[in-house]
UniProtKB/Swiss-Prot annotation:
EC number: 3.4.21.92
Self-association and partners: Fourteen ClpP subunits assemble into 2 heptameric rings which stack back to back to give a disk-like structure with a central cavity, resembling the structure of eukaryotic proteasomes.
Gene Ontology biological-process entries: protein quality control for misfolded or incompletely synthesized proteins
GO CC term (a single one): endopeptidase Clp complex
Pfam families: CLP_protease (PF00574)
Alphabetical list of PANTHER family matching this protein: ATP-DEPENDENT CLP PROTEASE PROTEOLYTIC SUBUNIT
InterPro entries named in the record: ClpP, ClpP/crotonase-like_dom_sf, ClpP/TepA, ClpP_His_AS, ClpP_Ser_AS
Protein name listed in UniProt: ATP-dependent Clp protease proteolytic subunit
Species this chain originates from: Campylobacter hominis (strain ATCC BAA-381 / DSM 21671 / CCUG 45161 / LMG 19568 / NCTC 13146 / CH001A)
Top enzyme class: hydrolase
Localization: Cytoplasm
Active site: residue positions: S97, H122
Keywords, alphabetical: Cytoplasm, Hydrolase, Protease, Serine protease
Length: 195
């Protein structure tokens, strides 16, 4: 992936940054692509760094993700709750599966999507092979994770758990406007939050 650089001029001269480091100075964290352990570790490290820099200032988590590994997503979710700063979530492009879950986990009142963003929720994906007892153990764990995800989505959206269970049984797509009505986000943004 090509990462652009920006040049900043200061009284002490010029300094070049990769674009993500420059955005981090403005407390912006980008979550792009599949959520795996490597991506989650990077996001968690940035959240912890920004908390250390200023624990009273909001952090902006921009999400454009098709989802990914549940445990990786949970590490981001737990860190969002662990740190003191409010984490505002903004969907750009898409937030599907674990991406949609994390979008809904932003600070209430500060969960956004751009007008043409797409949000999709569904049940966790998994598989098992091997001995019957191993398959049974894996099945129980997937069902436990599914129940946890549904409970948190219900809390975040204000929907009844039974509705979340029904809607996540299959892929459930929403426009940004529909996600507001559903309760996953609070507002569709037409203009930047910094204006």
């Amino acid at each position: 992936m090509f990462v652009p650089y920006v040049i900043e001029r200061t009284s002490r001269g010029e300094r070049s940054y990769d674009i993500y480091s420059r955005l981090l100075k403005d407390r912006i964290v980008m979550l792009s692509g599949e959520i795996n352990d490597e991506v989650a570790s990077s996001v968690v490290a940035q959240l912890l760094f920004l908390e250390a820099e200023d624990p009273d200032k909001d952090i902006y988590l921009y999400i454009n993700s098709p989802g990914g590994v549940v445990t990786s997503g949970f590490s981001i979710y737990d860190t969002m709750n662990y740190i003191k700063p409010a984490v505002s979530t903004i969907c750009i492009g898409q937030a599907a599966s674990m991406g949609a879950f994390l979008l809904s986990c932003g600070e209430k009142g500060k969960r956004y999507a751009l007008p043409n963003a797409r949000i999709m929720i569904h049940q966790p994906l998994g598989g098992a092979q091997g001995q019957a007892t191993d398959i049974e153990i894996t099945t129980k764990e997937i069902l436990r994770i599914k129940a946890t995800l549904n409970k948190i989505l219900a809390e975040n959206s204000g929907q009844k758990l039974s509705k979340i269970e029904k809607d996540t049984d299959r892929d459930f797509y929403m426009s940004a406007q529909e996600a507001v009505k559903y309760g996953l986000i609070d507002k569709v943004l037409e203009k930047s939050l910094t204006e």
